[in-house]
């Protein structure tokens, strides 16, 4: 029997008198086939350390621990720590860290792996309400996570992996794909969770690029330009840029010059621009003094 078997999950929750907290976005997976598929997608083996976020009662952790060198599981809910100590008692390669992943000192934590030089992969069932902040926090950290295989709301997975000229494409697509390749591996129906969420989930596989997709003069400015270009999706690039930078004659002259330098039409919408286009635009706007 597995932790994820519905009868085992129910017995564990009943034994510990556990009640779900909406504020933590808790939905526990009760399908062992999907858990095995997650591990297979992440290609976990004895030469890999894993960071898991939100282990719950240890359903995914069990599968990870059977395959990885070591698993470090970050759990924010104090009430789950003794439950994890119970369900994972047979594993000596699991560390449960009772901390918010957004506040944890990850540089220090990863040194606690028995072999900290092994590649690190992030595998997680992320709470819907905080998926994007966690992902961006990890991606932008200086820790060389090799790969992310994460479960999230299907809509967010579609946005992250979206291509230009699609409804899902936006600043989040650009922010992630600048650093990583991103592809939806498979869909997870809402019916395999306790309690069942209101929407389906997706497993997103992201692999870190050897270097960012493009080279830009100023990364912060590049991300700023991409974000502001989608503030009003139906507005033209020109309208979004002037709404942000201003509408004085001097500013408009600089914007016109920058757009011409980047060879981008002011009448285009942000969703039509590739990441490479945004790189050219940001560099050009920087060059003209914006």
From Swiss-Prot:
GO cellular component: cytosol
Binding site for S-adenosyl-L-methionine: 27, 29, 54, 75, 100, 125
Localization (cell): Cytoplasm
Disulfide topology: none
Catalytic activity: adenosine(1518)/adenosine(1519) in 16S rRNA + 4 S-adenosyl-L-methionine = N(6)-dimethyladenosine(1518)/N(6)-dimethyladenosine(1519) in 16S rRNA + 4 S-adenosyl-L-homocysteine + 4 H(+)
PANTHER family in the cross-refs: DIMETHYLADENOSINE TRANSFERASE (PTHR11727), DIMETHYLADENOSINE TRANSFERASE-RELATED (PTHR11727:SF7)
Name of the protein described by the UniProt record: Ribosomal RNA small subunit methyltransferase A
Organism the protein comes from: Streptococcus pyogenes serotype M1
Lineage: Bacteria, Bacillati, Bacillota, Bacilli, Lactobacillales
